Amino acid sequence: LRSVQRLNPALSELQARQLLNEITLILDNNDLGREFYNKLSSNSNIKLIDFQDADRNEWHVTTEFTCENQDSGDSFRPDITCFVNGLPLAFIEVKKPNNHDGILAERERINVRMSNEKFRRFLNVTQLMIFSNNQEYDNENRVPIQGAFYCCTSRDKAFFNVFREADKDFATKYPYKAVSDSVEKQILQHRNCVVIKNLPDYNTNKDTNTPTNRILTSMLSKERFLFLLRYGFAYVDRKIELEDGSKTTQLEKHVMRYQQLFASLTIRKKLDNGIKSGIIWHTQGSGKTALAYYSVRSLTDFYAAKNTAVKFYFIVDRLDLMEQAKDEFVARGLSVRTANSRDELMSDIRSTNLTENAEGKAEIMVVNIQKFKQDSAKIQIDSNYSIRLQRIFFIDEAHRGYNPHGSFLANLLAADKDAIKIALTGTPLLKEERESWRVFGDYIDTYYYDKSIADGYTLKLMREPVETIYKEKIENILDKLAGGIEVRRSDIDRNKIIEHESYLNALIDYIIADFRR
């Protein structure tokens, strides 16, 4: 109550209490906390958190904070709970290194809690959950057995994400507040564990460079945590197909992956330094469309602080990619416009209208340039607007449609010299493609296959030799297709071979047999 009144001095005590009562009610919603999060992170006149000045917020930590449903008596007590302005927005579960079942036991425990409706209110208010047994990650094991992981709430199953700090010295160089011996003793007395102060493990665990302390500093230091609270979560209305063939929508809550967090922070840093273009190389399947969504929210506020309005464009070169991107943005709550022609796009670019939807949602235009990407006609953009306007282009796999020597995209970006150009890719670039991409500048952020495999997002492909019996069978089929004629392998049309029914049947038989083993 005190924090609400301090951040909102225009509210009377009665109005502040009514606001807190409203929050209590919406936390009981069966919406994974969406309504509460929208209220927490919004730019409305009513503030629950001051996102601009970290020191205007009240920060507290407690141990074994009891979360109890008074009606049922069900309860649990996280090891550590973090409060911002009295709201329990994060908790940490910590275990000893080399503990039985590693971190798996914690994952199973939180999955049980997530499926228990009696805990819905507390899980709806909790934004970030961290689990650690203070060991380094086992990169050879896709199952999270050891390490420090984070997740957000879910209907029934938590997805444990790894966190790898981009700045290796972030934790060791962080300006921690010194804790006096008397305060340390007071904390240990409060926990009734003064005796552990003389144990070797105690001093080891206090080291800032342990896995647990690194993730806590990376994610819960004030500025980082406020950034995550403001921009790092997304509610996704995912379309799914049920067993009976019917389709429905399932609500999911997502938290930024660490590479999306660092790319978002680096984009802002580059813009602050006057750099208006760059390349983000994140491997396929790592969430580049989601990164664009997070960036819409982050960069809207970034330019609002400069009294500048923003229009966002996401450019693809195929119709199916346009539909896919549109669906991803809509599922996350953006209002999406589309353009399939040059005229549609140029009309929108020349317009000073910032929003077209009645709900006031953030907007993005998804553009398919497939039909007109080779259009080399010059483009004229009038920049004499009565409002300060910044256009931001996300170019998805731009190397496929970008020709610096004369194409629609090249002419468009050249005509809008003040535009922000963020090129996205996740595929290896050929030499000639790298040359054309130099116009976008240096890399903003990279996230390669090796990290994606280690993080469990990408499966490692294992090359295995084909068994002799099947190799001989396929060789016989090739001989039959040649009709008994002696020919060189280089003279055979490979496509006709691999599309032939006899070849396909033999190959499918081998694959099925291999999987059954």
Regions found by a protein language model. Give the residues of each.
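ATP-dependent helicase/translocase motor core
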Residues: 1-311, 316, 320, 324-335, ...
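Conserved helicase ATPase motor motifs in RecA-like P-loop NTPase domains
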Residues: 283-284, 399-401, 415-432
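Interdomain helical connector at the RecA1-RecA2 junction of SF1/SF2 helicase-like NTPases
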Residues: 434-517
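SF2 helicase catalytic motif II
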Residues: 384-420
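Structural recognition of the conserved hydrophobic beta-strand(s) that form the central parallel beta-sheet
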Residues: 131, 365-368, 394, 420-425
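Residues immediately C-terminal
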Residues: 321, 371-374, 399-403, 429-430
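Short basic/glycine-enriched coil/helix segment immediately N-terminal to the Walker B
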Residues: 84, 272-276, 305, 358-361, ...
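Conserved motor-coupling elements within RecA-like helicase/translocase cores
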Residues: 344-365
